[in-house]
C-alpha cells in the first residue's frame, strides 16, 4: 500500500515541499532564514489577530485601546510586545536572507528573486502601516512625514497624498484605512510566499559553492527539519529575552505619548529597520531626488542579476568580492546609525558619503571587481 503522504492530493504537495524535497547536502545555516521568515509570518498573523480583537481604529480611542490591551487583557502585554518585537526579528531575518542571496548569487534564480523583492516591499509597507496604529506621537508624525513624500511626484503628488490621507491631514480616515490594509496585507504576503516557494522548487535550492548540486541531494526531512528547528530555538530565545526583559528597547520613547498634531517631536524617525533607507532619503537635499533615491535603494535589488559579471556564481571563492560585500554591510550599518541621528554636522556629510558608497559598491565596484577576478583566474 502506498504511503498516505505520497498518495493523498494535499499531503502530496506538503510531502514534495517539506519532506521528500531533494536538497543540496552542503547548504549552511545561512539557508535557515527562509524557514525562520515563515515562522515569523505565522507568529505575526496569530498575535496580530488577537490584537485586532481588542484594538479600535479610531483616533480618539486607538492609543487607550493599546493601553487597555496591555493592562486589562489576559497576557495582552505579552501578545502586544511579541507582535512589536516580532516585527524586528522578521526584519533581521529578512535582511540576512537577502544578504545571503547576494553573497551566494541566489539572485540568478530571477523569478524567485523578483518575487522576493516584491515580498520585501510588501512587508515594508505592512510594517510601516502597523507602526501608525498605536497612534502615539511618532506614529502620527511618522505617517505624516512618510506619506507626505508622495507629494514630490510631479503633477499628481498633492492629490495622491490627500487621497491616501482621506482628507487634508493624517486623521481618522487615514488610521481606519491603514488598519484595514495592515490586516489584509499579511494574508497577501502568505500567498506571495507560496508563489516564491513555487518558483524556488522549480529550480531547486542554490548552495554555498554556487555549482550544480543535482548529483548530491538529500531529503529535506529529517536533515534540514532538525537544522531549521535549531534556528527556531535561537530566534525564539532572543525574541523572548527581548520581550520579557526590555520590550521597549527598539521602540521610540516618543511613541509612549498620545499623538498630538500641535506638538512636533524634535526628531521624527521611523522604526530602526527603515533607518538605512531614511538616511539615504535625507542625504539628498532635493525632495523628489530623495524619494527616488529611497525607492532605488530597494529597487536596485531587481537589477542584481544584470550586474553579475563574474564567471562564478557564489562569492565563496572570490576574496575581493567578499571584501566589497562586507564593506557594503558595514556601510548599511553606518546608514542605520545616521538615520537615527539629528540632521546636523557631521551626520549630514557621513550620510551623504555612505549613501554614495552604497550605490557605488552595487552599481560600479562589484561588477568591476568581478571582471578583475575573471581576468586574474584567466577565465
UniProtKB/Swiss-Prot annotation:
Report residues binding heme b b566: 97, 196
User: Which CDD domains is this protein grouped with?
Assistant: cytochrome_b_C, Cytochrome_b_N
Q: Where in the cell is it found?
A: Mitochondrion inner membrane
Q: How does it sit in the membrane?
A: Multi-pass membrane protein
Positions with a binding annotation for heme b b562: 83, 182
Q: Say which domain of life the source belongs to.
A: Eukaryota
Per the entry, the cofactor note is: Binds 2 heme b groups non-covalently.
Q: Which GO terms describe its cellular component?
A: mitochondrial inner membrane; respiratory chain complex III
**Which GO terms of type biological process are on file?**
mitochondrial electron transport, ubiquinol to cytochrome c
Which is a Pfam family this sequence falls into? Cytochrome_B
Cofactor(s) the protein needs: heme b
Q: Name one GO molecular function term.
A: metal ion binding
Kindly list the residue ranges recorded as spanning the membrane. Answer: 33-53, 77-98, 113-133, 178-198, 226-246, 288-308, 320-340, 347-367
Task: Provide the alphabetized UniProt keywords.
Answer: Electron transport, Heme, Iron, Membrane, Metal-binding, Mitochondrion, Mitochondrion inner membrane, Respiratory chain, Transmembrane, Transmembrane helix, Transport, Ubiquinone
Q: Which residues bind a ubiquinone?
A: 201
Briefly, what is this protein's role?
Answer: Component of the ubiquinol-cytochrome c reductase complex (complex III or cytochrome b-c1 complex) that is part of the mitochondrial respiratory chain. The b-c1 complex mediates electron transfer from ubiquinol to cytochrome c. Contributes to the generation of a proton gradient across the mitochondrial membrane that is then used for ATP synthesis.
Q: Which family does it belong to?
A: Belongs to the cytochrome b family.
Q: What assembly does the database describe for this protein?
A: The cytochrome bc1 complex contains 11 subunits: 3 respiratory subunits (MT-CYB, CYC1 and UQCRFS1), 2 core proteins (UQCRC1 and UQCRC2) and 6 low-molecular weight proteins (UQCRH/QCR6, UQCRB/QCR7, UQCRQ/QCR8, UQCR10/QCR9, UQCR11/QCR10 and a cleavage product of UQCRFS1). This cytochrome bc1 complex then forms a dimer.
Extra remark? Heme 1 (or BL or b562) is low-potential and absorbs at about 562 nm, and heme 2 (or BH or b566) is high-potential and absorbs at about 566 nm.
| Name of the protein described by the UniProt record | Cytochrome b
In which organism is this protein found? Fukomys damarensis (Damaraland mole rat)
Amino acid at each position: 500500500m502506498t504511503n498516505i503522504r505520497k498518495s493523498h492530493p494535499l499531503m502530496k504537495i506538503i510531502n514534495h515541499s517539506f519532506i521528500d524535497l531533494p536538497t543540496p547536502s552542503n547548504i549552511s545555516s545561512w539557508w535557515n532564514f527562509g524557514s525562520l521568515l515563515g515562522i515569523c509570518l505565522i507568529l505575526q498573523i496569530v498575535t496580530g489577530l488577537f490584537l485586532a480583537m481588542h484594538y479600535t481604529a479610531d483616533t480618539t480611542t486607538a492609543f487607550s485601546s493599546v493601553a487597555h490591551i496591555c493592562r486589562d487583557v489576559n497576557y495582552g502585554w505579552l501578545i502586544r510586545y511579541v507582535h512589536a518585537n516580532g516585527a524586528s526579528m522578521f526584519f533581521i531575518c529578512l535582511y540576512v536572507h537577502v544578504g545571503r542571496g547576494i553573497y551566494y548569487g541566489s539572485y540568478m534564480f530571477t523569478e524567485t528573486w523578483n518575487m522576493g523583492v516584491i515580498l520585501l516591499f510588501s512587508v515594508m509597507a505592512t510594517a510601516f502601516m502597523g507602526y501608525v496604529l498605536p497612534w502615539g506621537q511618532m506614529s502620527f508624525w511618522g505617517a505624516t512625514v512618510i506619506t507626505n513624500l508622495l507629494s514630490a511626484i510631479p503633477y499628481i503628488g498633492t492629490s495622491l497624498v490627500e487621497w491616501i490621507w482621506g482628507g487634508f491631514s493624517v486623521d481618522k480616515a487615514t488610521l481606519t484605512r491603514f488598519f484595514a490594509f495592515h490586516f489584509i496585507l499579511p494574508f497577501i504576503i502568505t500567498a506571495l510566499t507560496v508563489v516564491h516557494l513555487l518558483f524556488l522548487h522549480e529550480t531547486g535550492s542554490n548552495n554555498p559553492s554556487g555549482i550544480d548540486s543535482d548529483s548530491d541531494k538529500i531529503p529535506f526531512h529529517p536533515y534540514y527539519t532538525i537544522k531549521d528547528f535549531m534556528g527556531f530555538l535561537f530566534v525564539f530565545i532572543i525574541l523572548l529575552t527581548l520581550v520579557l526583559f526590555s520590550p521597549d528597547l527598539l521602540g521610540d520613547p516618543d511613541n509612549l505619548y498620545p499623538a498630538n498634531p500641535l506638538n512636533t517631536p524634535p526628531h521624527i524617525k521611523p522604526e530602526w529597520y527603515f533607518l538605512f533607507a531614511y538616511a539615504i532619503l535625507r542625504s539628498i537635499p532635493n525632495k523628489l531626488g530623495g524619494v527616488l533615491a529611497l525607492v532605488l535603494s530597494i529597487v536596485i535589488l531587481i537589477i542584481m542579476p544584470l550586474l553579475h559579471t563574474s564567471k562564478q556564481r557564489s562569492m565563496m571563492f572570490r576574496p575581493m568580492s567578499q571584501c566589497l560585500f562586507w564593506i557594503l554591510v558595514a556601510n548599511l550599518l553606518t546608514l542605520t546609525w545616521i538615520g537615527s541621528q539629528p540632521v546636523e554636522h557631521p551626520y549630514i556629510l557621513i550620510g551623504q558619503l555612505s549613501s554614495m558608497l552604497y550605490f557605488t559598491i552595487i552599481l560600479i565596484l562589484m561588477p568591476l571587481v568581478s571582471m578583475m577576478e575573471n581576468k586574474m583566474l584567466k577565465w
